[in-house]
């Protein structure tokens, strides 16, 4: 998990430094729009409830959330057609990259992704070319430190969890099969654990450490270029950054 975590930290730091709040709001708004197709009431729509929780955590204004729901559910004639598309490819050094996009024009999105990959030493591949290198799983982040590890273990015995990872920030990441996200986070809440966030994630089964710093820098530039594309919703990679790497 070391390299995966480092990439997450780099993304978080970049987001804070660049203050790209508008882009974040737009991205989350699209998630809400797609989720709202299954119903505008979050009480009966877990996907929508999850997207709204993410929006609130990011500070998205209530008005933005309401408009995104209206677009997805067709309220007031505002329905917008967005589709979820997964793209797969390789970065420099054979690093696997999996991109999830929300798009109203798949030809445009594919062209933009193909250009970004080619400009930064990678290539966009066929569906399935790298997804087998990842596990699509449920992840729930809770408040838990080492002192509560035994209690957490006891709780997980009665839940559909595959395991957990304790962080050094007073939090733990509980993970399980893809289909149990709703029941897993509900079960943790019922056992009085403070749930911070929950999501579906592509977790790398193996990781790739580039053999030289220049390749690592190329990979990071590719990931940054992909993240800057409007249609890109999330990026997963099996890149592992060496501890000695200097940006």
Swiss-Prot record:
Gene Ontology CC: cytosol
Keywords recorded for this protein, A-Z: Cytoplasm, DNA-binding, Transcription, Transcription regulation
Coarse class of the protein's main subcellular location: cytoplasm
InterPro entries noted in UniProt: Integrase-like_N (IPR017856), TACO1_YebC-like_2nd/3rd_dom (IPR048300), TACO1_YebC_N (IPR049083), Transcrip_reg_TACO1-like (IPR002876), Transcrip_reg_TACO1-like_dom3 (IPR026564), YebC-like (IPR029072)
An example molecular function term from Gene Ontology annotations: DNA binding
Subcellular location per the Swiss-Prot or TrEMBL entry: Cytoplasm
One GO term of the biological process aspect: regulation of DNA-templated transcription
Source domain of life: Bacteria
Residue stretches in coiled coil: none
Stated family: Belongs to the TACO1 family.
Matching NCBIfam families: PRK00110.1, PRK12378.1, YebC/PmpR family DNA-binding transcriptional regulator
The protein's name: Probable transcriptional regulatory protein SynWH7803_1972
Species assigned in the record: Synechococcus sp. (strain WH7803)
């Amino acid at each position: 998990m070391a390299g995966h975590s480092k990439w997450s930290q780099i993304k978080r730091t970049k987001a804070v430094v660049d203050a790209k709040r508008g882009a974040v709001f737009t991205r989350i708004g699209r998630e809400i729009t797609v989720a709202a197709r299954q119903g505008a009431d979050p009480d009966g729509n877990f996907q929508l409830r999850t997207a709204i929780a993410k929006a609130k955590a990011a500070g998205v204004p209530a008005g933005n959330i309401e408009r995104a729901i209206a677009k997805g559910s067709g309220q007031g004639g505002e329905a917008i057609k967005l589709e979820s598309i997964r793209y797969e490819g390789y970065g420099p050094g054979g690093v696997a990259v999996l991109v999830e996009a929300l798009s109203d024009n798949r030809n445009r999105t594919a062209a933009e992704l193909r250009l970004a990959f080619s400009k930064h030493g990678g290539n966009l591949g066929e569906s399935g070319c790298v997804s087998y290198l990842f596990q699509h799983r449920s992840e729930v982040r809770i408040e838990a430190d080492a002192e509560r590890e035994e209690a957490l273990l006891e709780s997980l015995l009665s839940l559909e969890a595959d395991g957990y990872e304790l962080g050094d920030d007073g939090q733990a990441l509980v993970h399980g099969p893809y289909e149990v996200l709703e029941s897993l986070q509900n079960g943790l809440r019922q056992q009085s654990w403070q749930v911070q966030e929950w999501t579906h994630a592509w977790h790398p089964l193996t990781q790739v450490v580039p053999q030289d710093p220049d390749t690592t820098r190329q990979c990071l530039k590719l990931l940054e270029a992909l993240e800057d594309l409007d249609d890109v919703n999330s990026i997963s990679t099996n890149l592992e950054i060496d501890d000695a790497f200097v940006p």
